[in-house]
């Protein structure tokens, strides 16, 4: 009944107006699944490869017709007739068909689109929501949202070197209330930025992108907005950073071009420690560059027992790199992006490895998103307790928050909001 009878891919647009892959999977019983693949701006060197056409006459070379052809021809031929419920086998077949260590032949965007659409079709056939199909009866934890309210780095055209300044409403009683808290802080931040003479244009992920001189200035505005909304910084709402340090790591040093400052790895670790001591920061992502393992070790030893240190470019949702980090005692959390590794099975394996090692896991979007809300379901399915999906603006971001609100409503009395316990270093 769940045999795959059709797989069809198409080229659609993401939130930046760039093409991406969308896949439909149809089963023998008429069940259907659809998934759209996100795309990153600051990408780790060790990520699975997003296959682009390179034809400058279409979308400036960013077209995905090759990936679509791979889905409609090679992948469909390999999967036709297989049972959609056998997710592990299906993903394994696609990975073997690709045959490269980074999915560069078929494209991670091709493989992932099919992988997620297959899971959705199987869930449809089972008459279950995706979070329940993937996570089973234990899937009931609603994640703390890491809401990106100020953008910098490659996500914005401003002098701020850090990529994201986030709020984490850990004290809220529910995801619906957490979204309300975040929205109220977001709107008050907009007002305070305007009063201070800053523009309130938004970046790729919906956060404001003001011309602020430093990370400290951005953090000050965040704290003021939290207080103006009637919440207590460091109690009701914490702060989070995504430094995206790989983007400004040059010749062994961290070059803050916006501030005109250069820091050695040791100075970078000390700077992050200083920030975390001065502000109610609960989480720092990619505070060191992806291959600066010594720097990561230093910052972990310095503040890893106090706050969450998230590896994004460091781990790229890859169990091999995560295993190495665990063995070396580096970071204490992994950012989970389905398109970094390129299949649902491998994504779930990364979350499982992290949780078994006592690391936290944060389900995450990409800066180039679509209206697809799969990651909201996956956050609940894995009970990971945290989700990073942008600001309180742009429908490509709010689609995920809205889906979480629906899931919470559907779970009813079974629903549990993760709260402060999601951040083990602080709980």
From Swiss-Prot:
Protein localization: Cytoplasm; Secreted; Cell surface
Gene Ontology terms: biological process: glycolytic process
Entry-linked SUPFAM superfamilies: Enolase C-terminal domain-like, Enolase N-terminal domain-like
Cofactor-binding details, from the entry: Binds a second Mg(2+) ion via substrate during catalysis.
Keyword Metal-binding: yes
EC number: 4.2.1.11
Family matches, as Pfam families: Enolase_C (PF00113), Enolase_N (PF03952)
GO cellular component: a single term: extracellular region
Molecular function per GO: magnesium ion binding; phosphopyruvate hydratase activity
Listed pathway(s): Carbohydrate degradation; glycolysis; pyruvate from D-glyceraldehyde 3-phosphate: step 4/5
Keyword terms: Cytoplasm, Glycolysis, Lyase, Magnesium, Metal-binding, Secreted
Residues the entry annotates as binding (2R)-2-phosphoglycerate: 163, 337, 366-367, 388
Cofactor(s) essential for the protein: Mg(2+)
Glycoprotein among keywords: no
Recorded catalytic activity of this chain's protein: (2R)-2-phosphoglycerate = phosphoenolpyruvate + H2O
N-terminal signal peptide: none
Residues annotated for Mg(2+) binding in this entry: 242, 285, 312
Function in brief: Catalyzes the reversible conversion of 2-phosphoglycerate (2-PG) into phosphoenolpyruvate (PEP). It is essential for the degradation of carbohydrates via glycolysis.
Family: Belongs to the enolase family.
This protein's name: Enolase
